[in-house]
């Protein structure tokens, strides 16, 4: 059993085919009507031209003799009751007479020879030959409306309009999300070497308060030997005595002079000028 989608597709195709057939039939019907009206207009024009040509040929085939004989017959039909004149001079012209009675219709002329084909007439007209000039006939009835013509080409694009006035400023939008941290910048170039600092000796500050007593120092060096005494009498050797106690430490020596400044070390900050040498 076909599915619903297959039935829908078949129905759509059938509908399109029916619409196409109806559209084609409408176009063919319009073409047939247009061809019929064009053919009838051509046929009516041909009949008018044929009638005008026949009338012109009939008028041109009547000879002057037939016209005169017909006039003589009309004059002979009138009564002749007056006396005949004998060598009388002509009198003055009389007044115009009354209009005569209508003459009898003339005899129909013989049928004219068959005309040349239409194509030959066109060639004769182009060559400068004599052609029958037929008066234009009455305007025929209005034809049926023709089929709509095809859509014309697109027009040229119009000129750009004048620029509008600037619109009012819109409300301030919400703050955007924080951006990602930027990449670390490249290391900067080395700066110029700084100028050499000025060397100076600070003024010694005031003496501070005495500090606490420090721990006992280590034993001092043995004192220098005394001057040799006068030789005494040799006594009996005595017993070795106990070692004597250590002597008191000697006083501190004087402070030495300041040493010369040492050479500059590696790159390091210079000491502040207000520093005090201890």
UniProtKB/Swiss-Prot annotation:
Its family remark reads: Belongs to the cuticular collagen family.
Assembly and binders: Collagen polypeptide chains are complexed within the cuticle by disulfide bonds and other types of covalent cross-links.
The record's GO molecular-function terms, alphabetically, read: structural constituent of cuticle
Residue ranges of coiled coil: none
- What protein does this entry describe? Putative cuticle collagen 91
Q: What does this protein do?
A: Nematode cuticles are composed largely of collagen-like proteins. The cuticle functions both as an exoskeleton and as a barrier to protect the worm from its environment.
Compositional bias ranges of the Gly residues kind:
158-167
- GO cellular component terms, A-Z: collagen trimer
| Alphabetical UniProt keywords | Collagen, Cuticle, Disulfide bond, Repeat
